[in-house]
A protein has these predicted regions:
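Macromolecular interaction modules
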Residues: 2-296
Length: 296
């Protein structure tokens, strides 16, 4: 008698034939090379359905099953976290309440182009199959090239493990370096001078910096074209505490140092906490009653 699993499929399954994107496994070290940062706003009244669609289907079918995509994680910004945003509104989110769900994916160094071509083709295939979710809007979806990292400890959390580590919070900070300032000079100040002074004794375990990359010309049309500004840098701050507990000692102090140095300005600091997979937790806490567009 044929055994079946929980989905009713034959226990003895046949392998699917290879498609146009074969994975060629090499002996390269596991190093972060690039990332996808996608900040999305579900439309009011569709937040539960959006959360379930994304975590049960799109998180995997849109990225995680792709070649050289070795880590991913989802985060959420509740209304109380959005109230911390600085400045608000910002050049990244526009209206204060936008950008409730963030997904970040790590791509293996040296394989960005292979992964990117697969990702665009895959999302187009999902569109054709009716497996996308119409009731949501992209707020900031862009690719980033890994630049550098700085850990609080001498032998601390490496970037490659950051999305798997159980961080209590995350802050995405977008900063523009001063006009005429060389990128290498700004990076050296951040990595070798500013952060070694700021991080000790704070909840900020790791900072990962990344520079914007352009989307492919044939990227899906529902993703707004965001120009890759070469003066703008994204830093991801992985926290041991809730963002509110780290805001003054980490985020505000960082902004004051960057702008006080004359080397740049912070254009957005956006706090998040991890989602809880398999639950609807936080879907009822995305917006406050006085947010623009809140249900009456």
């Amino acid at each position: 008698m044929t055994q079946t699993d929980a989905h009713g499929a034959d226990a003895e399954r046949k392998e699917r034939p290879p498609r146009q994107h074969p994975i060629v496994a090499g002996a390269e070290p596991i190093k972060l090379g690039s990332m996808l940062f996608t900040l999305v706003e579900p439309r009011r009244g569709h937040e539960v359905a959006y959360n379930r669609w994304y975590e049960r289907d799109h998180f995997y079918s849109g990225c995680m099953i792709g070649p050289y995509n070795f880590a991913g994680k989802r985060f959420v910004a509740t209304a109380d976290l959005k109230a911390l945003r600085d400045p608000d509104p910002s050049e990244i989110t526009g209206e204060p309440a936008r950008g409730s769900y963030l997904s970040i994916y790590w791509v293996l160094d040296g394989y960005h182009d292979v992964w990117n071509r697969w990702a665009v083709d895959q999302v187009k295939a999902l569109h054709r199959a009716g497996r996308m979710f119409e009731e949501r809007d992209h707020v900031h979806t862009l690719l980033y090239r890994y630049a550098w990292e700085r850990s609080r400890e001498a032998d601390g959390l490496p970037a490659e493990l950051a999305l798997d580590h159980p961080s209590a919070g995350l802050v995405a900070v977008f900063a523009d370096r001063a006009e005429g300032l060389d990128a290498a000079e700004f990076a050296a100040w951040m990595r070798d001078e500013h952060l070694p002074s700021l991080l000790p004794g704070t909840p900020a375990r790791l900072v990962v910096a990344a520079d914007p990359l352009p989307l492919l010309i044939d990227a899906p049309g529902d993703v707004p074209r965001t120009e890759a500004d070469d003066r703008r840098q994204l830093t991801l701050w992985f926290l041991d505490s809730a963002p509110a507990e780290a805001w003054d000692t980490v985020v505000s102090a960082h902004r004051a140092a960057v702008e006080g140095s004359g080397k740049g300005r912070v254009v957005a600091a956006l706090p998040f906490i991890p989602t809880i997979p398999g639950t609807d937790t936080y879907t009822d806490r995305l917006w406050s009653a006085d947010d623009p567009g809140a249900a009456s």
